[in-house]
Amino acid sequence: MTQSQYRPGPDANGLFGSFGGRYVAETLMPLVLDLAREYEAAKADPKFLEELAYFQRDYIGRPNPLYFAERLTEHCGGAKIFFKREELNHTGAHKVNNCIGQVLLAKRMGKKRLIAETGAGMHGVATATVAARFGLPCVIYMGATDIERQQANVFRMKLLGAEIVPVTAGTGTLKDAMNEALRDWVTNVEDTFYLIGTVAGPHPYPAMVRDFQSIIGKETRAQLQEKEGRLPDSLVACVGGGSNAMGLFHEFLEEPSVQIIGVEAGGHGVHTDKHAASLNGGVPGVLHGNRTYLLQDEDGQITDAHSISAGLDYPGIGPEHAYLHEVKRVEYVSITDDEALDAFHATCRLEGIIPALESSHALAEAIKRAPKLPKDHLMVVCLSGRGDKDMQTVMNHMAAQEKQA
């Protein structure tokens, strides 16, 4: 396994193999080129890195723990399961790792206004949080469907001073919110910084977001070394756009002994038209500035994604994931809504931790695999966020089940 094979970049054009790139309107091209230049300069600037480390430690609360899930391990009766506790970060998810990095870059570039898209609302909350901390006005684009199912996060964003713009186009979900945010950016290129929440979008976003999230994997390596004296045997993380997964995976891509599993949202099943599994049920195409795997119909039109989890409800996936899928370094599987809900309840009851429905997809895959593995197998699951935001969804689901019973 060589560096050039699994951690190739991206190259100067933002490509991971044939995926990624910069498919943007002419008006945006100077902006993304400028952003790439500024990001490269920031990465090489010790002052920027020092400031980033300060906020990671004192504002986000890093490092967060790598926790041995003893009762879940006993319940499964196989592999030793560890949780990387991203839900303990300030704002309750991994999203803030990226937001703090990007807001420091926006500040460095002299931008006066932040915009962002959000699905589950966690990236919106994290963006509104850093906007408040740095005194910047902030506009969040959110699909009307997602606003409906994520009322608590909408209120949190408003409390933090953000303006929320409901998007009714299409299915009123993340894809549509991202379209609107891109339109805003084209119109306000001079003073506005677009804070993309996942490893998608035009170059340099996929690489930049991955880099800001890669602290997850770096901490995991050091923490497991301290606890067990060795590398993990497997890593499991949920994948929508895929930033928590890339954050965990990137550190280990060149370690051939580490098996890496990305978990897509299988919705009602990948054999139906109600899922969000782009790699297991999609084909390559271009969306939101990059070439990747997408859910599309025979005419190449983007089809609607479905997942019980608003954060995985996206018809594409980050281009680096598409590349890692094609070169077979990472195995991508899917978990249904029902399997994710079962894992959600099991984690609540066994560990006293209420996980996000997104993270519950990764937990479900871990629960499936662990019993078949030896007791000395070390498995790390990324607990990407907490489940407070999902209470209404779970309550509705339980009420519907009781009616059927």
From Swiss-Prot:
This is Tryptophan synthase beta chain. Pathway: Amino-acid biosynthesis; L-tryptophan biosynthesis; L-tryptophan from chorismate: step 5/5. The beta subunit is responsible for the synthesis of L-tryptophan from indole and L-serine. Tetramer of two alpha and two beta chains. Its EC number is 4.2.1.20. It catalyses: (1S,2R)-1-C-(indol-3-yl)glycerol 3-phosphate + L-serine = D-glyceraldehyde 3-phosphate + L-tryptophan + H2O. It comes from the Bacteria. The keyword Lyase applies. GO terms for molecular function: tryptophan synthase activity. GO terms for cellular component: cytoplasm. Keywords: Amino-acid biosynthesis, Aromatic amino acid biosynthesis, Lyase, Pyridoxal phosphate, Tryptophan biosynthesis. Belongs to the TrpB family.
